Each structure stands twice: as structure tokens, then as C-alpha cells.
Amino acid sequence: SILLIHEIGFDNFTFKKLGFKIGSNESSIYRYFESKHKLLLYLSSWYWAWLEYQLVIETFSISESKAKLEKAIEVVTKTNTIDSDFSHINEVILYKIIVNESSKSFLTKEVDTENKEGYFEIYKRLITRLKEMILAIKPEYLFALSLASSILEGGLHQNFLNEHFPSITNCKDG
């Protein structure tokens, strides 16, 4: 599904097209996901969990708060490379899907219900981890959550601009 979504875009993606691509019938895919929106929620959650894993691994041994936050920002805003630990997922292509399509997972009428059902827990936990690193440097900072979510979403947005509107960003590949 990742390769097909990347190839034709989420809006043009259907389970029928996926079934044709993988040599299976459409109904077999519906056994796993009731809609393409639920598939996008799953892929987004997988990505946020993988990014959280990267964040924890990369910052665990850093004791100095400023250096830890700098490394965390680097981890959550960089363009991804292949992770050989997860051979069943192409993180580079999944990252491109997240950059281009992830907002479609939460800019919906169902977002509040899906939030209550826990679909965004990993995403929120990742932002909370960043917030804690910000507060470790400046405990009295009142807007740590806003800054943390802006760092995460801003990185995605800048990478989107780099890919599609490079003349309006200073973000360059990597």
C-alpha cells in the first residue's frame, strides 16, 4: 500500500487498485482496514512509533539538556533514510507519504472520536517527549507543548515546501 499511495497519491488510492496491484481481491483488504482513511491512520501511527523509537535511541545517552533537545529536533525534522531494522517498511517512502498526506488522517470530522479511541496516542506522546526536553532547559516556559508540536509539524511542512515549493523555504534536502 505504501508504494501505491506514493505512486498515485492518497486521493487516487483505492483498495480495488491495491488489490489489483498485489493480485488479491478488494474484499480481502477490507478484512484488515474498513476504509483507506483507517489505513492512513495505521500508516501514520506506525511512522510516529518508528520516529519515537528513533528519538529515544538517539537521545537516551545524552545527559546535557540542551544537547538532548538539539539532537531530538534533528531526529524529528530530518529527511529519513532506510532503516535496515525494519525491512518490511520503506521508511523513505513512508516519510514522503507522511509529509504529503498525514494531515488527511486528522483533518476530518471524525478526529475527536478517533482521538478518544486512541488513534493519535503515539503522535501525542512524541510531542510530549519533546515538551519534556524543552522544559528540562527552561521549566518556566509556558508554551512548551505549542513549541513541541510546532517543531514536529513545522519540520513536515518545511519538507513539503522543499519538495513542492523550494523557492519559499530555506529547508534543503536532509
Can you name each region flagged by the protein language model?
Residues D11-K38:
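Helix-turn-helix
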Residues Y42, I57-V92:
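Hydrophobic alpha-helical connector segments
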Residues K17, K68-K71, V75, S146-E153:
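Amphipathic alpha-helical interaction segments
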Residues L94-A136:
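Amphipathic alpha-helical packing segments from all-alpha helical-bundle domains
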Residues W50, Q54, D83, E101, ...:
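A short secondary-structure junction motif
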Residues S1-T14:
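Short, amphipathic alpha-helix enriched in basic
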Residues K116, L135-G174:
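Hydrophobic/aromatic-rich alpha-helical bundle segments in the mid-to-C-terminal region
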Residues I2-L3, F33-V56:
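An amphipathic alpha-helix adjacent to DNA-recognition modules
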